[in-house]
Amino acid sequence: MTRCALLLLMVLMLGRVLVVPVTPIPTFQLRPQNSPQTTPRPAASESPSAAPTWPWAAQSHCSPTRHPGSRIVLSLDVPIGLLQILLEQARARAAREQATTNARILARVGHC
């Protein structure tokens, strides 16, 4: 195998490790809690069971979940597909070169 083909094969094998979910996961920005301007404090008249007023509190129960039909996609799907095509072309070229070399050797042996 040529160096290029070996490199492509190695990239194909190592590229399968990285997995990225299809849907982006929302990121939540937490504000510093030791700052008095950003930390809301409940009033004394509010009941302890009242919903918190923090901006991220309403979103905390909405954790991203995978649906049964969702699919995990490799982040390198397209490049890996291209590398597979290039690897097949390199193998075909190497086979043609080997066949040409064999034909030259057989032609020399036949003429001796």
Swiss-Prot record:
Q: Where is the composition biased (Low complexity)?
A: 38-58
Q: Does the keyword Secreted apply?
A: yes
The GO cellular component terms are: extracellular region; extracellular space
Give start-end of the signal peptide: 1-22
Record propeptide residues: 23-70
Keyword annotations of the record: Glycoprotein, Hormone, Secreted, Signal
- What does the sequence similarity comment in the record state about its family? Belongs to the sauvagine/corticotropin-releasing factor/urotensin I family.
Q: What is known about its subunit structure? A: Binds with high affinity to CRF receptors 2-alpha and 2-beta.
Protein name listed in UniProt: Urocortin-2
Gene transcribed to yield this protein: UCN2
